[in-house]
Every structure is written in C-alpha cells, then in structure tokens.
Amino acid sequence: MSEELGKISKPQAENVQLKKKLYLVQNIQNYFPGNKDFESLLKEYWDSISDQLDNLEKTAGNINFIYIEGMYQEYDVASKLLNDNNKWCLSTIESRVKSGSNYKKIEDENNYKQLIDWTRIAQLGFVSENAKEVTEENYKKIITERSTIIHDELNSIKEGEAALFMISSGSHK
C-alpha cells in the first residue's frame, strides 16, 4: 500500500511542552472608532485569538511571558494605554497576567522613540540626496539596534517556556 503524501503526524504534547515556544499574534486595533461593524469584527477576532491561546496552553503549557510590539512601558502604564486604544488586546492578555504570565516590555524607550522620529522624517520626502542618505543611514542603524534588542529578549526564553508576542508588523524574523 502506498504512503499518503503530505500527511504530517501530530507531535506528542509532552514533546511540545519541553521546547521553547513563541506565539505570534497580529495586534489589530480599532482603526475606525464608532464603526460598529468593525468593532464587531474586532471582538470576534480577539475572542478567537483568546480561544486559540487557551487551547495552546492546555496542550503545550502556560504562557510565561507576554510582549507587545511598540510598548516600552511597564505593565501598569501599558495596560492603561491598551485600555484606551485596544481594549480587546488588553482583555486577551489581562486574564493571562492575572493567572501568572509575566508581561515584559519588548522595546527600549529611547530606541523606539528614535524609530518613530526617523520614520516620520522619511515619510516627508526629500529634496536633497544628502538629507535622504543621512535619514536612510540613521533609520537603518536604529532598525538594526531595535532588531538586536527584540532578538536578545526573545532569545532569553528558556527551553520549556512559552511567550506571546503581539506584533504590529510582519517585519520580524
């Protein structure tokens, strides 16, 4: 009898629990305040994310760490910002923090603020080639530093631990 092509066997749960795990979730915010249809879709999205994370925790172990891209504040400040800007994301992480997950900031404040500034400058456009080159050079430098900061933090996760990383962009490797 021939073997079925494309069949992937399900890994044993105990094997998964011994490994490092990083769960990436797209941090979708409410870009259309007051639009009830969009808010309904957001609620569905975040409810689905929470359910999927619950299922992962049942089989692969609890989430030890929670990171949110763009957040350099400690949890008390970050949670207030999330409450104002993305209550669905806050709801998803708040229950996990209360049950023992450790929220950790993923960004360095100075680095992140410089990234915002260089991004804004780049969006203005350029008349001179020199200004463009200076901006590109500084932007690349700050992006490289940021990537190292995030990479080092994520590499601190130990075998058997799990982390949730709420990302705003798809630029992480």
Walk through the language-model features, giving the residues of each.
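Compositional signal for N-terminal targeting/processing segments
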Residues: 1-173
